[in-house]
Amino acid sequence: MNYGKLGELGSVSRLTLGGGGIGQVWGPTSHEEAAATLRAAVEGGIDLIDTAPMYLNCEAIFGETFEGALPAHVRVTSKCDLGTPPVGQAASLLEASVLRSLATMRLERFDLLFLHSSIAPEGYAYAHGDSRRDKFSTRWDLYVDEVVPALEGLKSKGLIRAWGITGIGVPQTVLQALDHATRPQAVQVIANLMDSAGGIRRFAEPAAPRTILAKAKENGVPVLGIRAVQAGALTAELDRDLSPNHPDRKDFERAQGYRDLCRTWGEDPADIAHRYALSMDGVDTLILGVKNRDELARTLKAEAAGRLDPAQIAAIDQLGLRT
């Protein structure tokens, strides 16, 4: 395992274990296998685990697996999908979310807490799901006036060590947050060869993840790359049922040429996709969506193989898959 630096957390493994796979967001796995995967990740050199209350039973499995005795070198992140609550409630909602998650996971503090809801301009109308925007989107004025002070307050209380944002919101507002006087201490950014957010993209504008990556690097904000295999679209086969019109299904079909290219190299598409993401400038650690030990072992092997060479990256980029 190679290691890099992630801001206030210091040295971290280049791979981060994501809670989505553990919580069965990315297809089925057993409770026992999820727990075994958690332990195997730590044994394999991964020292950062990314969790969230919305990842189904991820937090409960984590708590049962480590029983309050997490290895000292392992760091843990969590998230709050705050949305846009009534004025004056953001701080209490964020703290309540953190306290619930800490209790479930049998921890005293999170190393990183991410605002998981999309950040959007005032009055912004989403192309998809706009009627529910206050559930999944945090408006800019609320972010500045309440959310940032509340997150800084959680640091002062010792409940979190640092805070960040999930940079999947409207790109102009994510960039604005990265330029704000009180910047996030980390940002999660789409990092895949298609530049695609798939089914989690609700806005009409281009996703612009590489622009966000560049801005984060320019401003010294550490980056956790996400969706390296684009929710399965960059794997040999999808591991869950999706409708023909689902964005992730459409990406899978659009990536057939990529799978053909990997076949000529004698490589697994998921392995190459992970190595591509790890080769992207500005990605400090890559969050995995693995759900069992077999998938974990393959990604550990892919990380050990190192970055892709420039010719491979060029061949992939020439497929024209970027959104």
Kindly label every feature range from the protein language model.
Residues 42, 93-114, 153, 157, ...:
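CE4/NodB-like, metal-dependent polysaccharide N-deacetylase domain
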